[in-house]
């Protein structure tokens, strides 16, 4: 089963935050995960060309950097050879049984998925009344709900992207006009998901928490 379960984790990493990288390296070792840190496009190194798609009066440089790194991850996912591709931001803390729970829960993931959100960012959850015993993967609508935030995303701290999802995202991004990104990453991604009518799922219970929300880290944005 382990041999067939090929997954790579792409980490959206701001390089000055070395303690975050070290913490995650230990986590990946503990859970036997293949990983790749996305370290290009730090906020200090962004070119005018990189920034063309942003309205920089509305999106600060650290968020521009964050979004560009997510886009870079989509490009890698589109072309990689792994069955599953996971994007993590560098402030995440993995569940103690992360690998086993992920392997087990992914057996329920429908093949039509574009994204699967697995973390509890912003403390967004499928309401208990909508959950079913032994069901770990839930379809998530793309519109705003009282319980589900601004749309399909929880935050962009931990989510899987399928090859077809990554391909749609990369194609969409190549058509963006100058100054068209005017929102933080999770709000922008909600808009893209609606524009592309992507198929979105949430995992319950979640298996990733954000270190900036627990107080382990200060926010880097």
PLM regions and their residue ranges:
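An acidic/histidine-cluster motif and surrounding catalytic segment
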Residues: 1-88, 92-221
């Amino acid at each position: 089963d382990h041999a067939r379960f090929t997954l790579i984790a792409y980490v959206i990493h701001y390089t000055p935050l070395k303690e975050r990288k070290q913490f995650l390296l230990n986590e990946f070792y503990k859970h036997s995960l293949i990983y790749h840190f996305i370290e290009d496009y730090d906020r200090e190194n962004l070119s005018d060309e990189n920034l063309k798609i942003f309205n920089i009066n509305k999106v600060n440089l650290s968020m521009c950097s964050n979004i560009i790194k997510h886009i870079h991850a989509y490009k890698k996912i589109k072309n990689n050879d792994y069955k599953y591709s996971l994007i993590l931001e560098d402030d995440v803390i993995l569940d103690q049984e992360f690998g086993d729970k992920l392997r087990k829960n992914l057996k329920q993931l429908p093949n039509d998925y574009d994204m699967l959100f697995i973390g509890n960012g912003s403390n967004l959850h499928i309401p208990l009344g909508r959950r079913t015993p032994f069901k770990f993967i839930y379809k998530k609508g793309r519109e705003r709900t009282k319980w589900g935030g601004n749309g399909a995303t929880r935050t962009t701290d931990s989510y899987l992207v399928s090859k077809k999802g990554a391909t749609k995202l990369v194609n969409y991004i190549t058509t963006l006009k100058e100054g068209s990104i005017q929102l933080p990453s999770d709000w922008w991604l909600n808009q893209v998901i609606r524009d592309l009518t992507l198929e979105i799922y949430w995992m319950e219970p979640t298996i990733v928490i954000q270190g900036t929300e627990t107080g382990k880290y200060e926010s880097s944005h």
